[in-house]
Design a protein with these regions (language model features):
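Aromatic-residue-lined binding/catalytic grooves and analogous aromatic/hydrophobic interfacial grooves
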Residues: 2-443, 450, 461-463, 481-484, ...
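Asparagine-centered strand-capping/turn motif at beta-strand->loop junctions
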Residues: 172, 761-765
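Alpha-helical scaffolds flanking conserved acidic
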Residues: 334-338, 473-478, 642-645
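Short, glycine/acidic-rich hinge or "gate" loops at secondary-structure transitions
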Residues: 355-364, 472-474, 492-502, 557-564, ...
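Extended, hydrophobic alpha-helical segments in both membrane/secreted and soluble proteins
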Residues: 448-462, 475-489, 643, 660, ...
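Short loop-to-helix capping motifs
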Residues: 468-469
Length: 815
């Protein structure tokens, strides 16, 4: 069988994952499958030779949830505050949650529901040789190849972003060598310890088959717990050979190849949707290459919109297994750092689309029933999954996240009113597509009020990077105003004229003086999280109010409210420093810092915000750096994949390239599966992260990695751009293109050993900024195309002014 590169992507080398083994996680092989997706439909290929499984999912298929009817318990807020004023912190922390419990409030979260498995069984006459499974990220094609005797075989699959169909082709090198038995059925779980097929699915699943002329069809459907059907139709198109239909299977034998086309439906009625999908499948072309070309024309430009090169060409053909073995030696290979950056972008592009839902923590490839931590969690995780989008040129794919929260605003207003008696919105940290009421009825979640404000920065960043004033006026500012209204009612003015925030939670942490000895707490993960004046609360509020004032003036709205917001800003207390020289996590004397924790949200003013930099406030910057250092040194065994990714982003922002790289290295050694999915924690008792046997897949770290690499190479704020601010020694040479500035784009290449750096800036809107070059770069010159100029502003600094449509090239060293 010749390699005709029908994928339309990269034939070999960069932007490919290569594995020498099939998915092998016992009972949960989906965890190591290779993913393909079109933003709403996902397919995960296990890679078995004899009995292949392809897990099929749809982003809108969730089950098991039930929104609660929230009672009005706003009277508890003054009660909680009285308790806290009297030092009864434990009682105060639990009061809201206990009150809801006494009133019988219950809200149940949904989880993703796997749609179906495609099983492909084939006879094996001799043992396999030269096995490979690959993912071409440029095209989204997953392929499995092997040899048996003198024959070679391949299965190739992608999910079309153009035609909304799963396309799979079975190939053999010898005419008539393709034989397979095909079946659609409920997703199978092999691990008895985890939940199996839901009763509603098991009792309602139905399969029918038919061979009509040269085509075969398999129809599959089952019922969700809401009584609505979901399912799929498979069309089988063999080239040559024979095709027969059994009760629930279709068999192909003696074929040269076989094309499989699958369309899925959710929230429907099986008979009607089967007929509709059969008509759609009958109208689709029958050539794999043609369908791939149509899909690649949409997927490819998204994936190739940005590129980073850190590795030599000689490294590009390594397998995932080889990359991981090298990472275990302790040094993160530049090629693995690059590949993980590309893979995170691939997962994001494949896991969401503009008219869909935000990407969830499992992407579109969850194979668990009742999956752990599968909801959208906005006390860091959702935000981490979108940190990369603007600089990475994928701002348009943040729109589903904005729409998701906007569509639930009335429930968020109800939450704020009934829980706290406040105007504006209260967004629970955890939500699902069908449930925006609080379903984590515990103090650490209920008493945290920062989700709306933290999410608001993403709305404003979208405006900053697109210049879309309609979005600013009609969507960003109204959302931000609702978040600010909540703070207006929730914050209290203390006797010294400063604001108080209480109860106040620093996400998922408990002050050190409220922790049991030895940090063990009888299974209660958060013994006393509710404090006064969490630093994060005021960091979020300060950024929100600053941007709301700025944006309102730009858009010419809310003029009568700006004075109020300015007064609130003036009343926000200053950040405080503890006896260790670290920024305090709680700005109140009754609450001591606790460094042994995975969350590090109080570093928000440094990252993701731009409030504190070394240039603006060197002393405070050092105090933030000390708080970060103590987290990593003291609490390495308390970290997770996403916390290592968060730390990498923070160290990159602090221009500590070696430490940022070490965080990525720790992540790779502890929380990376062989298909490069990130999991929450290590499962092998290796001492680097938390220990949790199930180690759930959590793709926040995959996407946090993308942001960290970008931050290491490029710092972007509205008025400042820093080239290579956090470049580790291992990345001595490389290039980047397609990364975004607030008003345009930038491409650059460097070789530190030679002191060379070349950067080209393109302005799409009026651009005025300070550009900082790395200290190792030599003397620089500039050349403009169009109305643009660069003026020296101190060592390694230039003031850049560019008109729309102009280009400016900066060259340093002997470039």
């Amino acid at each position: 069988m010749k390699d005709d590169n029908r994928s339309g992507g990269s034939a070999r080398g960069r932007n490919r994952l290569v594995l020498r083994t099939p998915a092998s996680w016992w009972g949960n092989a989906w965890r190591e499958a290779l993913p393909s997706g079109n933003g709403i439909v996902g397919a995960a290929v296990y890679g078995a030779v004899s009995s292949e499984t392809v897990l099929i999912n749809h982003g809108e298929l969730w089950y098991g949830g039930k929104p609660g009817e929230l009672p009005d318990v706003s009277h508890t807020l003054p009660e909680v505050r009285r308790m806290m004023d009297q030092g009864q912190y434990r009682e105060a922390s639990a009061h809201l949650a206990e009150t809801l419990g006494r009133l019988g409030y219950e809200s149940v979260r949904e989880t993703p529901l796997p749609l179906a498995d495609l099983n492909i069984r084939r006879p094996v006459d001799s043992g396999f040789r030269r096995y490979r499974r690959t993912l071409d990220m440029e095209s989204g094609e997953v392929s499995v190849r092997w040899e048996e005797g003198s024959d070679a075989y391949e299965r190739a699959l992608f999910v079309s972003r153009k035609d909304d169909v799963i396309v799979c082709e079975l190939r053999g090198s010898r005419k008539g060598s393709v034989a397979a038995e095909l079946e659609l059925k409920p997703h199978q779980k092999g691990e008895a310890a985890s939940p199996g097929i839901p009763k509603c699915v098991e009792e309602s699943a139905a399969v029918s088959t038919a061979v009509l002329a040269a085509d075969g069809y398999i129809r599959y459907a089952a019922k969700n717990d809401d009584g609505l059907d979901f399912g799929a139709v498979l069309r089988v198109i063999p080239q040559g050979g024979t095709m027969t239909a059994g009760r629930d299977k279709i068999a192909v034998s003696g074929a040269d190849s076989a094309l499989l086309l699958i369309k899925v439906f959710v929230k429907g009625e099986r008979e009607r949707d089967w007929l509709r999908l059969e008509r759609e499948l009958a109208a689709i072309g029958q050539a794999y290459a043609e369908l791939m070309q149509r899909h690649a024309a949409v997927h490819g430009p998204l994936f190739r919109s940005a590129a980073i090169r850190l590795q030599d060409e000689s490294e590009a053909d390594r397998s995932n297994e080889e990359w991981l073995l090298e990472a275990y030696e302790g040094e993160l290979p530049p090629g693995l750092a690059e590949t993980m950056w590309a893979y995170g972008r691939y997962l994001f592009i494949s896991g969401t689309r503009e008219d869909g839902l935000p990407i969830p923590l499992y992407g579109l490839w969850c194979g668990d029933y009742k999956a752990v931590w599968s909801h959208l969690m906005a006390n860091e995780n959702v935000q981490m999954m979108y940190w990369h989008t603007d600089v990475g040129g994928l701002s348009a794919l943040a729109l589903p996240m904005f729409r998701y929260y906007e569509e639930r605003m009335e429930q968020f207003r109800d939450n704020a009113r009934k829980l706290f008696g406040c105007r504006g919105i209260f967004i629970p940290a955890g939500t699902t597509p069908g449930n925006a009421t609080p379903f984590q009825v515990v103090p650490v979640i209920l008493n945290w009020t920062g989700a709306a404000g933290w999410l608001a920065r993403h709305f404003y960043d979208y405006y900053l990077f697109t210049g879309d004033e309609s979005f600013l006026r009609e969507r960003a500012l109204p959302f931000m105003r609702e978040a600010a209204l909540f703070y207006e009612d929730f914050f209290v003015v203390a006797g010294d004229g400063k604001l108080l925030s209480y109860p106040s939670v620093s996400p998922e942490n408990t002050p050190g003086n409220f922790m049991p000895e030895n940090h063990t707490f009888g299974g209660v993960g958060h013994p006393m999280p509710s404090a006064i004046n969490a630093t994060l609360d005021f960091a979020i509020a300060k950024e929100l109010l600053t941007q709301l004032i700025e944006g309102s003036r730009i858009a010419g709205v809310y003029a009568g409210e700006i004075g109020r917001w300015e007064e609130m800003l003036a009343r926000i207390p200053e950040y405080q420093i503890n006896e260790d020289g670290a920024v305090k996590e709680w700005m109140h004397p009754d609450f001591q810092d606790r460094y042994r924790h995975r969350h590090i949200s109080h570093i928000y003013p440094v990252f993701p915000a731009h409030e504190i930099t070394r240039e603006k406030d060197a002393a405070l910057f050092v105090a933030f750096a000390e708080a970060v250092r103590r987290r990593l040194v003291i609490g390495i065994g308390d970290q997770t994949a996403w916390s290592f990714a968060h730390l990498a982003n923070i160290y990159a922002r602090m221009e500590e390239g070696e430490l940022a790289l070490e965080c990525l290295s720790l992540l790779a050694r502890s929380c990376l599966l062989n298909n490069f999915y990130t999991v929450h924690n290590d499962w092998r008792q290796m001492g680097i992260s938390l220990n949790y046997r199930r180690a759930p897949v959590q793709m926040d770290a995959n996407l946090g990695w993308v942001s960290a690499v970008q931050e290491m190479l490029l710092y972007v704020s509205p008025g400042t751009v820093k080239l290579l601010p956090s470049l580790p020694q291992a990345w001595n040479a490389g290039e980047a293109r397609g990364l975004r500035l607030c008003t345009g784009s930038i491409a650059f290449a460097w070789n530190r050993d030679q002191g060379r750096l070349v950067a080209e800036l393109k302005a799409e809107r009026k651009t005025e900024l300070v550009l900082r070059l790395p200290a190792w770069a030599g003397e620089w010159t500039w050349e403009a195309a169009g109305e643009a100029e660069a003026q020296a502003a101190g060592p390694h600094r230039a003031v850049i002014r560019m008109a729309p449509g102009s280009r400016l090239t900066i060259a340093a060293g002997s470039a």
